[in-house]
Amino acid sequence: MDEELRSLTERLRRESGGAAPYEHLASTGDLDELAEVLTAPGHPLWARELAAFRLGLAGDRRAFESLVLFLNHRDPPRCASAAYALVRLDDPRTARAAAALATNELRVAYALHPVRLLADLHAPESVPALITTLERRLRPHDPYRRVALACVQGLGELGDPRARPVLNDALAHPALAEAAVHALGRIPRQR
């Protein structure tokens, strides 16, 4: 069992109080039953998250909408689990959804995991969305330095020359300068 799955199962076991329904959802192999949890009324949040996560890991695209909602949740562990499952779901809609969440100024406080997801996806939408998000975070006194740092790191990981101007701008910000130097070092030199 990998670390993200272990963390999720422990957290949701605590939320559920270790009830029998939790054990059943954690062990069932019936994907239709898990999908039903996402659409039927009356299921607690922990059950919906567990069902969406398990469907995502199984590559069942019925989990997509629920996972995107969890990616935009105010609780960071839910966001992290959703991002993990979305990478494994391999749905072509994921990058567009992550880009929309990362660039939404009204939800910037919750953009950290969508930004990290964009870097993990290496999708065509990733670099433009990370550039846009980072440009907005370079304003004076912006309170979202963790989002800005994740953008810098993601752009370095992606190594796209289009990121060079915004990464050069990030050098002027002490909290980002070291990461920007590393990111710029990962971008191939133009000839």
Residue locations for each model-derived region?
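Amphipathic alpha-helical scaffolding segments comprising HEAT/armadillo-like alpha-solenoid repeats
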Residues: 2-7, 26-40, 60-72, 91-104, ...
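HEAT-repeat alpha-solenoid elements in large eukaryotic scaffold proteins
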Residues: 5-16
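Residue-level detector of extended alpha-helical repeat arrays and alpha-solenoid scaffolds
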Residues: 18, 48, 79, 111, ...
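Non-membrane alpha-helical segments in proteins
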Residues: 19-20, 45-57, 80-85
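Core register positions within helices of long alpha-helical scaffolds
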Residues: 21-24, 54, 85-88, 117, ...
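Short inter-helical turns and helix N-cap capping residues of alpha-solenoid HEAT/ARM repeat scaffolds
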Residues: 42-44, 74-75, 106-107, 144, ...
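Boundary/linker segments of alpha-helical solenoid repeat arrays
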Residues: 109-111, 138-144, 175-184
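Extended alpha-helical scaffolding segments
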Residues: 144-169
